[in-house]
UniProtKB/Swiss-Prot annotation:
Belongs to the aerobic coproporphyrinogen-III oxidase family. The gene is hemF. PROSITE patterns: COPROGEN_OXIDASE (PS01021). It holds the Pfam family Coprogen_oxidas. This is Oxygen-dependent coproporphyrinogen-III oxidase. It catalyses: coproporphyrinogen III + O2 + 2 H(+) = protoporphyrinogen IX + 2 CO2 + 2 H2O. Disulfide bonds: none annotated.
Length: 309
């Protein structure tokens, strides 16, 4: 008997329950790592349908700014960013649920990170629903450490292995391609996992894969923070961190599909733009000093590679 891709009647409730639990688990872990500052929760409603819970930590001991956002929005018409490449979505009402987070640390030796898991369904009367999962996690170091990159990608591999040996290399390559700043001709970071439009085998299979990736995020990030958060740094390192944060802002405002979807669908601007760094510095035509640790980021870490060889 073939496995069905039919959407269970309670799919939204299942996913929402998991996402709220994931948001809480991640926030508890980050508060424990920081040891000083708690998240502030801001619940919000969207006039066109839905709402969410945005949790923000600011000026902590370890984290300069961290945002962990849950949203569940719905509407009668899809924004252009979602329907442009999928004609079958025209004329359907939609629901989109997700947890999205971005963490900007105080210490430049601790990488910035982003993670997202989401579900999307578009429905129309007398038609089968169109649904899929998406998400992933990626790492943006300022000063690279090989052992951190290997740990990050090993944890990403562990998240994917239960679903087949082809998943990690596919999602890893997708991440490298997606988080590439075309106008700079450089990667945003050292990658990780990225997937979208995932609707394979069955709803249960697809949901389990999304959960595995969501659950492995904190396992990937926490040990790296623990190793790097107490390394001494000075003005030079902080200035480089703020300069590189400019690349983060450029990517999010120019290319990121989640940002574009949120803004075009009338989402909550404060929650959508929580990903932006608290302090950013642009400097005209700046280049790192030859042989410096700053240059090594560009030469040894940002170019896409297989970290598990």
């Amino acid at each position: 008997m073939p496995i069905s891709k039919t959407l269970p009647y309670n799919a939204i409730e299942q996913i929402k329950s998991y996402l709220l639990q994931l948001q809480n688990t991640i926030c508890v872990s980050l508060e424990s790592i920081d040891g000083q500052t708690k998240f502030h929760e801001d619940s919000w409603q969207r006039a066109a349908g839905g709402g969410g819970k945005t949790r923000i930590m600011a000026n902590g001991n370890v984290f300069e700014k961290a945002g962990v956002n849950f949203s569940h929005v719905s509407g009668e018409q899809l924004p252009a960013s979602a329907s442009a490449h999928r004609e079958e979505l025209a004329g359907r009402h939609f629901s989109a649920l997700g947890v999205s987070l971005v963490i900007h640390p105080q210490n430049p030796y601790v990488p910035t990170t982003h993670a997202n898991v989401r579900f999307f369904v578009a429905e129309k009367e007398d038609s089968e629903p169109v649904w899929w999962f998406g998400g992933g996690f990626d790492l943006t170091p300022y000063y690279g450490f090989i052992e951190d990159c290997e740990h990050w990608h090993q944890t990403a591999l562990n998240a994917c292995l239960p679903f087949g040996e082809t998943i990690y290399p596919k999602f890893k390559r997708w991440c490298d391609d997606y988080f590439f700043i075309k106008h700079r001709n450089e990667a945003r970071g050292i990658g990780g996992l990225f997937f979208d439009d995932y609707n394979e085998i069955s709803f249960d299979h697809s949901f389990e894969l999304m959960r595995s990736i969501g659950d492995h995020f904190i396992l990937a990030y926490e040990p790296i923070v623990a190793r790097r958060k107490d390394i001494p740094f000075g003005n030079r390192e902080k200035a480089f961190q703020n300069y590189r944060r400019g690349r983060y802002a450029e990517f999010n405002l120019v290319y990121d599909r989640g940002t574009l979807f949120g803004l075009q669908s009338g989402g909550r601007t404060e929650s959508i733009l929580m990903s932006l760094p608290p302090i950013v510095h642009w400097e005209y035509n700046w280049h790192p000093e030859k042989g410096s640790n700053e240059e090594k980021l560009y030469t040894d870490f940002l170019p896409a590679k297989d970290w598990l060889k």
